[in-house]
Amino acid sequence: MASGKATGKTDAPAPVIKLGGPKPPKVGSSGNASWFQAIKANKLNIPPPKFEGSGVPDNENLKSSQQHGYWRRQATFKPGKGGRKPVPDAWYFYYTGTGPAANLNWGDSQDGIVWVAGKGADTKFRSNQGTRDSDKFDQYPLRFSDGGPDGNFRWDFIPLNGGRSGRSTAASSAASSRAPSREVSRGRRSGSEDDLIARAARIIQDQQKKGSRITKAKADEMAHRRYCKRTIPPNYKVDQVFGPRTKGKEGNFGDDKMNEEGIKDGRVTAMLNLVPSSHACLFGSRVTPKLQPDGLHLKFEFTTVVPRDDPQFDNYVKICDQCVDGVGTRPKDDEPRPKSRSSSRPATRGNSPAPRQQRPKKEKKPKKHDDEVDKALTSDEERNNAQLEFYDEPKVINWGDAALGENEL
């Protein structure tokens, strides 16, 4: 595991770090998005929101005099087969003097703007809080200590101890492997003659047959959550989730076969036996914190010891030889095999199937590509949509949780 990487360079000062939970940074940003997640209308054509309390999201970083701003409506559209399709409005909060309506004074009348202020707010003050760079910071979870919007609106619950994506995480895991020895001798239970990789592959197949399922949306969430919490969904390559494989630095585990097959490669499940749990990584590692311009980097150094008398010792060594700095290589036994005939007898009239009568093929109408549909959206609408999450019809994927570290071999 490796230390977090900066996602971009900026001249802005680094945000003040508080380890008690995520909070909007005290400094401005070069982005143009709201610091907070949106409230979403439950259906189309809903009137502007009304709030039980002040309507200002909780932000402990600001003084009470600075707690004022506006909610702005964003009409959003979703690409569809017949063109763009309207979806219920989203409303985003900005502090006075920031965001798309930065030129307005508090209380100025404008369609799609709802002004709000907390108790003791000085509405003549124009905020220097700025707006969010969505490539560097997650949306901050909405909390209203004095009452939120009316029942026509909702917002997705985000726990305070983490964000949804890996773009803003400053702490990622880095681990090599040397630590208090874990029990890796469970292989003795089934006998040393049982091949480790074959058993790992069987675990995945058995779990998939049991019908454990996740939706397309869930698979996408697994692959794009905070970097240090990601897992590889089915039908994803390793580099789609954790970036390209490298040599001699972070991200150096996995050969080309493992990268292509992802969790279908039995070697993945086998090696997850040696990967520390979250608690083991935290309390059994050498933890090194380091403040960087983009945030706090945490490095975890952990060692797992496989005893030489372990029945699967040779298999673990073999996998490491193949996969450590393995980019650009494949296992020697992973050669494509020619397809063989089901029978060694030559095909004759007596044993050959009769040719089927060929039906004329129907001409298929060309499908409308997504990029053609996307052209129906303006640049402003595409930017608005980028801040929202759409809920597509679930595409069911058969999935087993064996490769997520829950099963020991």
UniProtKB/Swiss-Prot annotation:
Compositional bias annotation for Basic residues: 358-367
GO molecular function: RNA binding
Chain positions covered by the region annotation Disordered: 1-32, 46-68, 164-196, 238-258, 326-409
Region (RNA-binding), start-end ranges: 29-160
Keywords, in A-Z order: ADP-ribosylation, Disulfide bond, Host Golgi apparatus, Phosphoprotein, Ribonucleoprotein, RNA-binding, Transcription, Transcription regulation, Viral nucleoprotein, Virion
Bias (Low complexity) ranges: 15-31, 166-179
Similarity comment: Belongs to the gammacoronavirus nucleocapsid protein family.
Record's subunit section: Homooligomer. Both monomeric and oligomeric forms interact with RNA. Interacts with protein M. Interacts with NSP3; this interaction serves to tether the genome to the newly translated replicase-transcriptase complex at a very early stage of infection.
Protein name, as recorded: Nucleoprotein
Organism encoding this protein: Avian infectious bronchitis virus (strain M41)
Gene: N
